[in-house]
């Protein structure tokens, strides 16, 4: 029986093959003078090149060459050129085995290389076992081991030896971690954890399954369901210190395993492992459920506000008829009075003849009532949501362990008094600003009526959580921001930031650039040379660009797509996986081994991408039933694996010759696409009026200039898209190579402009109402006369300088991956008071936005690039809509995780299609040229790899029984 391998063929190649790219050859295989001196001591050319190749292989990847190993032509040419020896000389090298062995002995003697034996091997084994806890995968640990061997001049042992060593080290590390967690638990806690698996609840589900089934809701019943779970978890009394010494990725892995196991499966594993998984789940779920409660409260507040606003609007709308009649009557009365005055008629008679005095009294009362109605605002109606809050809020405030900044102290004190459910004789309003509109409504309340005051507290508590003035300990989303920001020393060492640590250097640079830019714009305004626009009397006018598609491009596009072969979606997936091996990313959550059932895994990915679901796919495929697909999905399909697979496909597509026609991967666009969830979309049951009354979510996708969708996020349909732009750019290597990022008006905020510049991205927005945007300058008095009416204010240099260290730390924290940019930007945008850090970043953003606006006005090429980039992103929507064939295009999953996998699967399938189309479009171009037909290079950028007419998407999904690898 053949031995089972841990590494895939591609992983082995990445770890042990000789490099062939020019950069690696220059880095590792450039020979020094001493090397050349040692090599020239070999008399024959074949011995010189053979000796040199053995030396190069020992240096990188660190192994000995195998007898009869085929050396890549690139390596032979590179090494031979340094020696003046032809590559073919290697053919006669080491006809005697002793020659190769003698050369190896000489290399070991000269350079100090040693074999993996004895004390050195024991030391490396101990070192590897020590590294295993921090390693994220078999491949990661193997890479660390290989690097360590190179550092210690140890020749790599056989691949099978490294596989066994890494596997043993990872298993030992896993057991050490499980034992360490179990030893931190008391006997009572262990008993309580075991009871989670034995206690059965209504519906014949275990307490463990009941605990892990939680989702963010939007009503008081959902909040109470979450509170039931949080209160139960608190009774288990497991301290976070039990996990203090465990690496974060190990905790996340144990949690994900616990969320994949059925109850019976957990009962059957070893006790230490079971207790470790259960303890991690309890600690992690406690924090996650607390976050979900805060998010549910956020949605309830939003729902209450929307209902109050709707009632306010309906009240005003219902008063329109009465208002019209009243105004007409008063108009007639006024006309009668004016006529009587001119005729000399007594005014009393004019009033009596126009309207009776009783009628006039009624009109005055009606007018007063209408005035009050029109002066009202939605706040007058939010008190009607009191009973909704009362059903869960006191309990929530008792359960949550609130911590706050000093500025939010009065608010937390008010919230705790609500949680204690004690009557408040004279409610404090110190948490309100003096100018707050709440004050007027609260003063109008009867003495002793605290209902509106409680609603005000809960509204402001929502805002405080958003801004970070109030936080929860151990929370990922609502934690203390100060604990997340990297220290200033670490921030200054961050080479990824595009700005200096000294604010004066930044200010000097921006002042110089802004002065030059303003002079350029003023000169263009005076001379009337603004492309497609003008500035007249302080008013900016910009005309939209027209389409620029050359004649004949459409005919070429149609011809190339006619040459594309028809293909089943199943065959396409097999072909792309055979070429790229993207399914290798889907390792087993427990063992880390790649999935051996490639067809089953592709079925799961296809079910996600086409929005079919596993049951429908099981009915449509000829290879797997539902339970087989469910097992594969449960243990192999993870968010991280989806991202890795996407990165593999995107990176490969970017290397295709046809991709270079569209761009070099240095620019990208981002846009949100709405997906309806209908009444089944309970996890994100949020309605955006822009898309009608149907609840839904958005897939916010980043698309490179090569059409590759390199990042995709699921976001609520109601939120602003702007904070999520930087998330996608920092998500993987493709995004980090982007220098110019395009977005539409939905991506516009000054905070985003500021953060983008700090991270080195040139943000280019297609702002719909650009002429209404004002410029911000350092000295308005020196602004050219033609532009003074466009200036909106003066940049606050002192504020920027005072807060520059914190701004710098925020940027470094984002690049370090400690917090998502969207989370940080949302917090900064949510401060109810004018926070200094938020205001300073806004000032930075205003300067960057001013520089961008001037450049946009003067640079038609930038406008054209943005239009092309955004068109590429929007063109993806049509392909994704075509792929979303299941469930009438609705995302009906009830969980946030399920919805995320639907969106991620759709994006991965889209990337696979784009890769396949790019390959075959390149073949079609070559075929056309071989036929002697013209393929104008200027036409090729107008072709896109987003067509799908040649792909069979529906019907049965048939797979070969033994696919070719």
Predicted regions and their residues:
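Long amphipathic alpha-helical coiled-coil/heptad-repeat bundle
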Residues: 2-511
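Structured nucleic-acid-interacting core domains from mobile-element enzymes and related host factors
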Residues: 649-686
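Catalytic or ion-translocation cores adjacent to nucleophile or general acid/base/metal-coordination motifs
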Residues: 89, 619-660, 687-805
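Structured, charged N-terminal subsegments at the starts of enzyme catalytic cores
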Residues: 515-620
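Short, conserved catalytic/metal-binding motifs centered on acidic residues
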Residues: 62, 617, 668-674, 741-746
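Long, compositionally biased intrinsically disordered regions
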Residues: 782, 789, 796-965
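Short linear interaction motifs
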Residues: 32-40, 587, 594-600, 650, ...
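Short, hydrophobic/amphipathic alpha-helical patches that form generic packing surfaces
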Residues: 51-60, 574, 578, 600-611, ...
């Amino acid at each position: 029986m053949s031995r089972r391998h841990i590494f895939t063929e591609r992983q082995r190649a990445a770890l042990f093959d000789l490099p062939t790219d020019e950069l690696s050859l220059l880095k590792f295989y450039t020979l020094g003078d001493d090397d050349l001196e040692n090599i020239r001591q070999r008399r024959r050319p074949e011995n010189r090149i053979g000796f040199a190749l053995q030396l190069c292989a020992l240096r990188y990847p660190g192994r000995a060459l195998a007898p009869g190993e085929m050396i890549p032509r690139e390596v032979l040419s590179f090494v031979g050129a340094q020696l003046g020896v032809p590559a073919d000389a290697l053919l006669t090298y080491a006809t005697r085995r002793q020659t190769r062995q003698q050369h190896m002995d000489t290399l070991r003697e000269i350079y100090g290389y040693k074999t993996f034996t004895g004390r050195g091997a024991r030391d490396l084994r101990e070192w590897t076992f020590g590294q295993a806890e921090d390693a994220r995968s078999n491949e990661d640990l193997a890479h660390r081991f290989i690097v360590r061997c190179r550092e210690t001049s140890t020749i790599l042992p056989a691949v099978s030896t490294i596989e066994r060593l890494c596997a043993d080290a990872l298993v030992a590390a896993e057991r050490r971690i499980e034992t360490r967690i179990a030893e931190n638990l008391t006997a009572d806690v262990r008993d309580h954890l075991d009871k989670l698996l034995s206690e059965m609840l209504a519906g014949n589900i275990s307490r463990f399954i009941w605990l892990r089934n939680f989702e963010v809701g939007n009503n008081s019943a959902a909040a109470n369901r979450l509170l039931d779970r949080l209160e139960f978890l608190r009774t288990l009394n497991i301290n976070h210190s039990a996990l203090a010494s465990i690496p974060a990725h190990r905790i996340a892995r144990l949690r994900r395993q616990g969320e994949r196991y059925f109850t019976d499966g957990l009962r059957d594993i070893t006790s230490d492992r079971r207790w470790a998984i259960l303890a991690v789940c309890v600690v992690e779920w406690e924090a996650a459920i607390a976050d979900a409660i805060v998010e549910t409260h956020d949605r309830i507040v939003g729902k209450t506000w929307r209902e109050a606003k709707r009632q306010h609007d309906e009240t005003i709308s219902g008063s329109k008829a009465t208002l019209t009649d009243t105004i007409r009557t008063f108009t007639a009365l006024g006309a009668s009075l004016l006529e009587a005055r001119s005729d000399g008629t007594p005014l009393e008679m004019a009033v009596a003849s126009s309207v009776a005095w009783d009628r006039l009294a009624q009109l005055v009362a009606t007018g007063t009532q209408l005035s009050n109605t029109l002066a009202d605002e939605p706040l007058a109606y939010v008190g009607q949501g009191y009973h909704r809050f009362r059903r869960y809020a006191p309990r929530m405030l008792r359960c949550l362990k609130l911590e706050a900044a000093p500025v939010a102290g009065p608010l937390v004190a008010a919230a705790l008094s609500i949680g204690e459910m004690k009557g408040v004789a004279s409610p404090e309003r110190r948490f309100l600003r003096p100018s707050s509109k709440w004050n007027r409504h609260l003063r109008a309340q009867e003495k002793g009526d605290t209902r509106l005051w409680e609603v005000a507290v809960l509204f402001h508590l929502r805002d405080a959580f958003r801004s970070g003035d109030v936080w929860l300990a151990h929370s990922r989303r609502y934690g203390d921001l100060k604990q997340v920001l990297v220290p200033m020393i670490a921030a200054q060492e961050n080479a990824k930031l595009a700005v200096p640590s000294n604010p004066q250097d930044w200010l000097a640079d921006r002042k110089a650039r802004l002065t030059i830019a303003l002079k350029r714009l003023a000169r263009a305004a005076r001379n009337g040379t603004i492309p497609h626009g003008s500035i007249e009397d302080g008013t900016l006018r910009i005309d939209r660009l027209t389409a620029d598609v050359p004649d004949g491009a459409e005919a070429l596009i149609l011809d190339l797509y006619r040459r594309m072969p028809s293909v089943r979606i199943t065959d396409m997936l097999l072909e792309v996986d055979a070429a790229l091996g993207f399914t290798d990313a889907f390792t087993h959550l427990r063992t880390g081994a790649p999935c051996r059932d490639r067809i089953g895994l592709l079925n799961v990915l296809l079910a996600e991408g086409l929005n079919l679901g596993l049951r429908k796919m099981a009915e449509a495929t000829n290879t797997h039933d539902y339970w087989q697909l469910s097992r594969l999905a449960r243990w192999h399909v993870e968010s991280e694996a989806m991202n890795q697979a996407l990165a593999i496909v995107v990176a490969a597509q970017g290397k295709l010759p046809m991709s270079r026609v569209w761009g070099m991967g240095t620019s990208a666009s981002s846009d949100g696409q709405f997906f309806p969830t209908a009444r089944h979309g309970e996890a994100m049951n949020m309605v955006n009026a822009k898309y009608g009354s149907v609840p839904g979510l958005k897939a916010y996708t980043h698309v490179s200039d090569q059409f590759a969708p390199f990042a995709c996020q699921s976001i609520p349909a109601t939120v602003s898209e702007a904070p999520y732009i930087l998330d996608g750019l920092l998500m993987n290597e493709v995004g980090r190579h982007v220098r110019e990022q395009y977005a539409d008006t939905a991506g516009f905020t000054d905070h985003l402009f500021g953060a983008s510049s700090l991270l080195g991205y040139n943000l280019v927005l297609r702002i719909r109402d650009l002429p209404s945007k004002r410029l911000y300058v350092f000295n308005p008095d020196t602004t050219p006369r033609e532009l003074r009416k466009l200036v909106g204010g003066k940049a606050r240099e002192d504020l920027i300088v005072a807060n520059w260290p914190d701004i710098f730390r925020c940027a470094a924290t984002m690049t370090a991956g400690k917090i998502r940019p969207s989370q940080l930007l949302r917090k900064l945008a949510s401060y109810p008071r004018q926070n200094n850090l938020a205001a300073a970043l806004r000032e930075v953003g205003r300067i960057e936005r001013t520089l961008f606006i001037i450049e946009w006005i003067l640079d038609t090429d930038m406008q054209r690039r943005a239009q092309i980039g955004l068109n590429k992103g929007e063109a993806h929507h049509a392909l994704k809509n075509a792929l979303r064939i299941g469930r009438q295009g609705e995302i009906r999953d009830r969980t946030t995780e399920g919805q995320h996998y639907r969106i991620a699967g759709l994006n991965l399938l889209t990337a696979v299609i784009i890769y396949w189309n790019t390959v075959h479009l390149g073949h079609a171009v070559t075929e056309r040229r071989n036929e002697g037909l013209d393929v104008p290079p200027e036409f090729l950028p107008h072709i896109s790899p987003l067509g799908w007419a040649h792909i069979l998407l529906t019907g049965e999904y048939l797979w070969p029984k033994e696919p070719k690898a």
